[in-house]
């Protein structure tokens, strides 16, 4: 579906790393769906499944099923094929 972002970002309002990832995505105009795991029980369960029981954020999930968990800016830029 063309209107559906390829990336789902699971994060939390209190998480500085989640804010950092959102800023990087926003600054490069990369569309994503944001789910706050403290406000969305289904999102919290998804993160726990992806991370083997841990509520690790930020967790990014691509449409192809690939994931990045708590990535550095450099690791995220490499995955996105962008320059910092």
Model-identified regions with their sequence ranges:
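Non-catalytic, surface beta->alpha helical segment in thiol-disulfide oxidoreductase systems
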Residues: 62-84
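Short amphipathic alpha-helix with an adjacent loop that forms part of the alpha/beta core around
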Residues: 47-51, 79-82
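Local sequence-structure signature of Cys/Sec-based thiol-disulfide redox active-site neighborhoods
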Residues: 1-31
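Thiol-based oxidoreductase modules, predominantly thioredoxin-like and allied folds used
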Residues: 30-44, 54
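Structural micro-motif
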Residues: 51-61
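Short secondary-structure transition/capping segments
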Residues: 2-3, 45-48
